[in-house]
């Protein structure tokens, strides 16, 4: 939820109220104080990757099939000719190798929501793409102004171009840390659909997950959940039946689970 709307999927906030609603949703549900944002469309991401010369991504044959399907839409959005990743189907769906792909295909890979892992795997793919982009930027930071010139028409942000350029030039100082899908402890599937009438991911519990998130992001700092977080957490627990007694008995993708490499500022 945010200050404008009732409970719904978190990602519906942007569609309903744009950046202001999105920031409100994040701040209200996670006890943050975010004021700035950057959003990009498919074309911006694909164009940025092309300026970097494409990416080398390890993909299974099954992921190649899905990426090729998504690329029909992405290549059209980018305004480039459709291309497909070649693969040998005789090697089976699980066969994996590193493939050099264009911006459109890398964006298509990041969109895959099918196969094992569900939404957590999809967001993992997105972090893989961002990780690889940062690595290439560190190798050639002079590409940053070219990327900005290429993509700014497809970017919505509260920051000025000069502010983005200044932030981007610090890319060479970034190190690669670890991150996890969020919420850390969660539930989804048939039981949630039966309880809520919607196919959604729910935190178990919201209050527990927000505590864990603040400890992960700001280790050692004292934090107590706001009244809003506690209220929303109790509401979700009552509606779903997944309360604090279920912590530790549901899917765990937080600290202690397998992590992904992501960006961490020095």
Regions found by a protein language model. Name each.
Residues 7-16, 30-36, 112-121, 134-138, ...:
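Second-shell loop/turn segments in exported
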Residues 12-87, 155-164:
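Amphipathic, coiled-coil-like alpha-helical scaffolding segments used for oligomerization/assembly
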Residues 36-39, 108-109, 179-183:
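Structural recognition of the beta-strand scaffold that forms the well-ordered cores
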């Amino acid at each position: 939820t945010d200050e404008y709307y009732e409970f719904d999927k978190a990602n519906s906030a942007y569609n309903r109220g744009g950046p202001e609603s999105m920031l409100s949703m994040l701040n209200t549900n996670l006890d943050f104080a975010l004021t700035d944002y950057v959003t990009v469309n498919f074309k911006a991401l694909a164009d940025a990757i092309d300026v970097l010369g494409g990416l080398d991504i390890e993909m299974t044959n099954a992921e190649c099939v899905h990426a090729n399907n998504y690329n029909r839409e992405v290549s059209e959005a980018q305004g480039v000719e459709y291309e497909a990743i070649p693969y040998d189907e005789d090697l089976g769906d699980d066969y994996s190798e590193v493939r050099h792909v264009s911006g459109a295909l890398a964006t298509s890979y990041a969109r895959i929501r099918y196969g094992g892992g569900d939404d957590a795997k999809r967001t993992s793919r997105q972090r893989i793409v961002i990780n690889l982009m940062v690595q290439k930027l560190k190798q050639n930071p002079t590409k940053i102004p070219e990327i900005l010139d290429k993509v700014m028409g497809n970017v919505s942000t509260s920051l000025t171009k000069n502010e983005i350029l200044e932030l981007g030039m610090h890319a060479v100082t970034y190190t690669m840390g670890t991150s996890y899908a969020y919420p850390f402890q969660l539930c989804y599937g048939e039981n949630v659909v039966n309880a809520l009438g919607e196919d959604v991911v729910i935190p178990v519990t919201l209050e527990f997950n927000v505590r864990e998130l603040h400890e992960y992001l700001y280790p050692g700092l004292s934090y107590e959940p706001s009244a809003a977080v506690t209220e929303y957490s109790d509401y979700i627990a009552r509606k779903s039946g997944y309360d604090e007694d279920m912590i530790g008995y549901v899917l765990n993708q937080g600290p202690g689970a397998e992590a992904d490499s992501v960006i961490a500022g020095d």
